[in-house]
């Protein structure tokens, strides 16, 4: 059963941090060839600090997917690393979080979960549920065009705030991701259209994708 939960940087174990940063290196350096710094086979940066919280999607104690969340009042990639990619960036004051370093380990996902789980959409729902549980008003993130397409396909009513150009001369987008009840409903319906999971569990945090069981007798 896939479970998604949050862990603050200060509570991140050495074992789990090594697994996370190794998977990030395999995703962002090896597969996507981003301009990221890697040490000892791991990718981490100045934003992996006490202000960071990580969402983990785990099956059988193995990390399948993850992202890093930072309240926008703290230093983050939008106002730091990615700022030069845009002509202007104006994040409003309020209870907002920045999401970065989102990935799904495709090999692990296929091996452990098979091809039937919409893991990205499940993780988007987790982001909504986490944000609602903590009282946040929304999420800001910067994505590539392929990730923009994946987000749109999920049905999540995202909005493009700004467009920019990366160091690889590829289009990137600053997005606002709403975390209201409508967003939650849309993602729950998309994930559970075949009634595979216990729906009440899909609106909770932490998030568990508990399969429906056949009635006995």
Curated annotation (Swiss-Prot):
Enzyme Commission numbers on file: 2.3.1.184
InterPro entries tied to this protein: Acyl_CoA_acyltransferase (IPR016181), Autoind_synth_CS (IPR018311), Autoind_synthase (IPR001690)
Cystine residue pairs: none
Superkingdom to which the source organism belongs: Bacteria
Catalysed conversion reaction: a fatty acyl-[ACP] + S-adenosyl-L-methionine = an N-acyl-L-homoserine lactone + S-methyl-5'-thioadenosine + holo-[ACP] + H(+)
Keywords: Autoinducer synthesis, Quorum sensing, S-adenosyl-L-methionine, Transferase, Virulence
Pfam families hit by this protein: Autoind_synth
GO molecular function: N-acyl homoserine lactone synthase activity
UniProt key word Transferase: yes
GO term, biological process aspect, one: quorum sensing
Protein family per UniProt: Belongs to the autoinducer synthase family.
Function of the protein: Required for the synthesis of OHHL (N-(3-oxohexanoyl)-L-homoserine lactone), an autoinducer molecule which binds to ExpR and thus acts in virulence (soft rot disease) through the activation of genes for plant tissue macerating enzymes.
Protein name: Acyl-homoserine-lactone synthase
Record organism: Pectobacterium parmentieri
